[in-house]
């Protein structure tokens, strides 16, 4: 079967299963199995798939119809222009989380020697993206999941920045021995009531939180009062509906700080910024 014909059939199957990204998913899976860039796939529609290639592709499409994310099927997700290894042990990096990296980079000089703590590092995407852009910065990457830390280390090593990063197994800020200059965190913030099929494959510990999704955000804000250095900063990704409540909570804990909510490219309230 030609790849163009397989692609048409695959898109039909995915659409019939309400997969909104059907065309893109089929293209990504073809690129993955053929080990060719997407541009090659588009310019060579006449290529004939081998039997093994077609069997593999059909198996992947079947898994995709069951809502398994493409990132887990290919063990890859692009974030901040970098490719990261991901599997079911870590949250799949989202485009909106790039705002956390952007925000931190705007606040730090290129040759600065500040210390950053990335709490709930997961795949390490935030840590690695910052390390690639700020060569003098020291980063502490913390996670409560040992498998996640192993993946973060793997990704850091693939970009040659592992020596700049301290990987720490721990819960939130409990393992930070001295205050840090910046705390960054993309913690679980989805309320249990908002569980959806498309995120059912991702680790629940990395997605959901109690107290309407605010439990861990409130904990890290409370703990950070003794973990931030003078003139320190903290940037937390939030669930847009939480913006007002979490902002009030932050102001109560840091009455003299500059506290603001930053919006993402979709104009949704996405980042809580606290500057001492």
Can you describe what each PLM-predicted range is?
Residues 187-216:
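Mobile active-site "lid"/loop adjacent to the S-adenosyl-L-methionine
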Residues 1-34, 39-42, 46:
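Non-catalytic accessory regions of SAM-dependent methyltransferases
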Residues 187, 275-276:
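C-terminal beta-strand of the catalytic ATP-binding
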Residues 98-196, 219:
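Conserved SAM/SAH cofactor-binding pocket of Class I
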Residues 34, 172, 265:
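Hydrophobic pocket-lining residues within nucleotide cofactor-binding pockets
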Residues 31-106:
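Conserved AdoMet
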Residues 85, 212-274:
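Conserved Class I SAM-dependent methyltransferase catalytic core
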């Amino acid at each position: 079967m030609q790849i163009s014909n397989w692609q048409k059939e695959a898109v039909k199957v995915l659409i019939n299963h309400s997969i909104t990204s059907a065309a893109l998913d089929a293209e990504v899976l073809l690129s993955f199995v053929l080990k060719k860039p997407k541009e090659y796939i588009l310019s060579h529609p006449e290529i004939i798939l081998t039997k093994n290639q077609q069997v593999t592709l059909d198996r992947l499409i079947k898994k995709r119809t069951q809502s398994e994310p493409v990132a887990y099927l290919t063990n890859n997700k692009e974030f901040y222009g970098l490719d990261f290894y991901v599997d079911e042990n870590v949250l799949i990096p989202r485009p909106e989380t790039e705002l956390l990296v952007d925000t931190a980079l705007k606040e730090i000089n290129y040759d600065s020697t500040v210390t950053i703590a990335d709490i709930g590092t997961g795949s390490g995407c935030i840590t690695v993206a910052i390390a690639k852009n700020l060569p003098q910065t020291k980063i502490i990457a913390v996670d409560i999941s040992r498998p996640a830390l192993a993946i973060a280390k793997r990704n850091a090593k693939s970009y040659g920045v592992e020596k700049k990063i301290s990987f720490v197994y721990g819960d939130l800020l409990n393992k930070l021995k001295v205050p840090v200059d910046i705390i960054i965190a993309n913690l679980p913030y989805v309320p249990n009531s908002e569980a959806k099929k498309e995120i059912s494959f991702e680790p629940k510990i990395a997605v959901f939180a109690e107290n309407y999704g605010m439990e861990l955000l409130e904990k890290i804000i409370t703990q950070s009062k003794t973990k931030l250095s003078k003139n320190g900063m903290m940037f937390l990704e939030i669930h847009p509906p939480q913006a007002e409540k979490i902002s009030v909570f932050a102001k109560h804990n840091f009455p003299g700080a500059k506290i603001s909510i930053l919006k993402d490219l979709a104009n949704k309230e996405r980042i809580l910024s606290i500057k001492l």
